[in-house]
Design a protein with these regions (language model features):
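Conserved ATP-utilizing enzyme core subdomain
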Residues: 2-14
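Short, charge-rich amphipathic alpha-helices with coiled-coil/heptad character
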Residues: 11-26
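N-terminal acidic leader/helix
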Residues: 22-55
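Peripheral, non-catalytic segments of secretory and membrane proteins
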Residues: 28, 105-106
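Amphipathic alpha-helical packing elements
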Residues: 60-104
Length: 106
């Protein structure tokens, strides 16, 4: 039986040569998952806010709660990822003041 030795390219050289190390591949896959998850949360917010805009009268409290939960989850997820610019998101998604008030944001 012959023993195999493992040979690893130094990280400094790997970066300059553009060689993907296991760590780089893992980071890339994690970023892909984060982006996909954030996109899904954003679509959930869009859907919940559309339902809120269309819903008046009886049952609005439940729709408002669903929209608030979706927005809160989305904002928390963004903050965990280091994306802290709430004002741009509020403007982009057209998040109503009543939703932000329920979250407790100023």
């Amino acid at each position: 039986m012959t023993a195999m030795s493992s040979l690893r390219v130094p990280q400094s050289l790997a970066k300059r040569l553009g060689i993907e190390t296991g760590d780089a591949v893992l980071r890339y896959e994690l970023l892909q998952e984060q982006a996909a998850s954030l996109g899904l949360a954003g679509r959930k917010v869009e859907k919940a806010l559309a339902a809120l805009r269309e819903h008046e009268g009886e049952g609005r409290a439940e729709v408002l709660k669903a929209a608030t939960d979706a927005v809160w989850g989305f904002l928390v997820q963004r903050e965990i990822m280091g994306l802290r610019d709430r004002a741009a998101i509020i403007a982009e998604y057209g998040i109503p003041r009543e939703v932000m008030n329920r979250i407790g944001a100023r």
